[in-house]
């Protein structure tokens, strides 16, 4: 009996594997639970937990847990928003440099605010924020636009239609504007962390070019409000 040709052999192999289901990029079966890295969740007593939370804690005793991602930690300095900003600032895969710039930026903000704190009179010190993480989050919130513009084609003509932005899109635009402003409009002798720390402090006080860019986008959306009915496509 002659040996089967290549195509016939492949057909027989595929016919014998029809009962198998291909699972791509899957390390864990559905019975594995997601890991919980927040220490405060485990420190709460059972009396304060709801019925659902108590059931979930009992399930974690008997069911296997997935391994935590390498970028997730239970450290008090872990911040998902800052990690996202660090990844967006990264160029060429050099995350160590991006992380170093972010740490230097937070340190520079801390030094600037402490200097301002000690120079201020005693009655004004309570109003000066010295936590760089609080300043970063508030500055990012001040840079987030509420409404954006979407290009809609109607009758062969393109219209810029104002549309509300989702939370992820707002955060992305704020981060992108901050990074672009610090890269494109800084002096060649000014370091990246110096420019970024100053941009964050300006945005914290509702000042700076990034906040102006947000207001300009809102003005353009207000000018194109006549095309808002095109949003229901």
Curated annotation (Swiss-Prot):
| Keywords from the UniProt entry | Mitochondrion, Ribonucleoprotein, Ribosomal protein, Transit peptide
Compartments where located: Mitochondrion
Coiled-coil blocks: none
GO terms assigned for molecular function: mRNA binding; rRNA binding; structural constituent of ribosome
Example GO biological process: mitochondrial translation
Q: Which GO terms describe its cellular component?
A: mitochondrial small ribosomal subunit; ribosome
The organelle targeting sequence, given as a residue range: 1-28
To which protein family does this belong? Belongs to the universal ribosomal protein uS7 family.
Name of the protein: Small ribosomal subunit protein uS7m
**What gene is behind this protein?**
mrps7
């Amino acid at each position: 009996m002659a040996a089967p040709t290549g195509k016939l052999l492949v057909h027989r192999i595929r016919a014998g594997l029809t009962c198998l289901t291909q699972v791509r990029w899957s390390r864990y079966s559905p019975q594995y639970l997601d890991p919980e890295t927040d220490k405060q969740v485990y420190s709460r007593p059972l009396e304060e937990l709801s019925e659902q939370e108590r059931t979930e804690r009992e399930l974690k005793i008997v069911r296997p847990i997935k391994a935590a991602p390498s970028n997730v930690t239970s450290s008090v300095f872990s911040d998902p928003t800052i990690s996202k900003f660090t990844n967006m600032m990264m160029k060429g895969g050099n995350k160590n440099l991006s992380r170093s710039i972010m740490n230097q930026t937070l340190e520079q903000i801390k030094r600037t605010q402490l200097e301002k704190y000690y120079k201020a009179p005693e009655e004004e010190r309570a109003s000066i924020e010295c936590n760089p993480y609080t300043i970063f989050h508030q500055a990012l919130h001040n840079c987030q636009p509420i409404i954006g513009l979407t290009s809609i084609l109607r009758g062969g003509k393109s219209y810029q239609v104002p549309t509300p932005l989702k939370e992820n899109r707002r955060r992305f635009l704020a981060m992108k504007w901050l990074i672009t402003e610090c890269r494109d409009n800084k002096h060649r002798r000014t370091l990246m962390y110096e420019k970024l720390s100053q941009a964050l402090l300006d945005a914290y006080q509702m000042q700076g070019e990034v906040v102006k860019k947000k207001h300009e986008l809102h003005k353009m959306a207000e000018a194109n409000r006549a095309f808002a009915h095109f949003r229901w496509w």
